[in-house]
Amino acid sequence: MAIHRSKIEWTDYTWNPVTGCRHGCPYCYARRIADRFRPQACERPEEEPMESLRKGSGMYWLKKPSQIVDQNGHRLRGTPYPKGFAPTFHEYMLSFPQHLEKPSKVFVSSMGDLFGEWVPDTWIEAVFESAKKAPQHTYLFLTKNPQRYYDLAFKKKLPQEKNFWYGTTITGPEQRFFCIRGINTFLSIEPILEPFPVGIVNWPAVPGWIIVGSMTGPGSKRHQPQREWIESINHICAEARTPLFMKNSLRQIWGEDLVQMYPEGMPSWTPGHKAIPHCKACLCRIEYHEGKRGTSIFCKAMGDKHVGARYARTSPPWCPKRADITDFD
């Protein structure tokens, strides 16, 4: 379990240093995935790398990847969910963003709620500190418990980094969300279960980005939104000049011309884009002699580490000193 390329349209990767949730949403896709990969009948997780946070707390701490074993103790396979959807801190995953050198959008804890009221501050702080060590990425946090954001901000424990975005999941217009001036915030209206009538929605402020999508998975056909609901959200965003991102799940309702906008400053470049030819003005370019193969040009972006060997004779698109490139699209 590491940073994975994501099928979620609005992000590039998912990173899950904390998994599990206690909200009990009936439409939760993450719980279905965790139940699929948890130990099944006649199986159990290997206990060695796992610690219980407190006896009887139902919360766990993993210092290394867990294995599933049979009744005789023979290893069967690895699993990131040895206790299913119980809240779990995967300490061994904290450094993973540093191994991903291309600037990317990273959805943090897609398989849980990092800001659930049951999560210790120490877990959240460890995730924040790890994210700060890889500042080339844009980190997208999402919760159904926005009060935790306010609590952390009051205790001065909520970083205000330009590449940190704090999101709230809501399903209707009356639900509370997090929005403070000077902090990047966004809304994920998914699944949208209620109408958002124009003129009735009375939000004190509109976040800097809004994502909207419909319910997917078993039983979702009975809970599809009406087009008018989406039009209302589109109107709200247009009035507030807030970028709107419609997920692909709305294609059958909205049509092919989905609105998929990102906030200004958030990289819309994705890892699939091609390398850009080397720029002579790059301040990080170095020459590396390879014997009979001659001289190759690399980009030294982080300390003494050579970044992007696959881009020999090119400057990687994520190079922080590319003077000639400001837009990777």
For each feature predicted by the language model, list its residue ranges.
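Short, solvent-exposed secondary-structure boundary motifs
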Residues: 84-86, 168, 273-279
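Cysteine-centered metal-binding/redox modules
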Residues: 1, 272-329
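Structured loop/turn residues at beta-strand edges in well-structured enzyme cores
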Residues: 23, 101, 205, 277, ...
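Conserved AdoMet/S-adenosylmethionine-binding subsite of the radical SAM
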Residues: 88-243, 247
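Auxiliary Fe-S-binding modules of radical SAM enzymes
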Residues: 1-14, 37-44, 50, 58, ...
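Short, compact, well-ordered microdomains
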Residues: 127, 131, 137-139, 246-247, ...
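N-terminal [4Fe-4S]-dependent radical SAM core
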Residues: 1-105
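Residues that flank catalytic or metal-binding motifs in active/ligand-binding sites
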Residues: 11, 162, 315
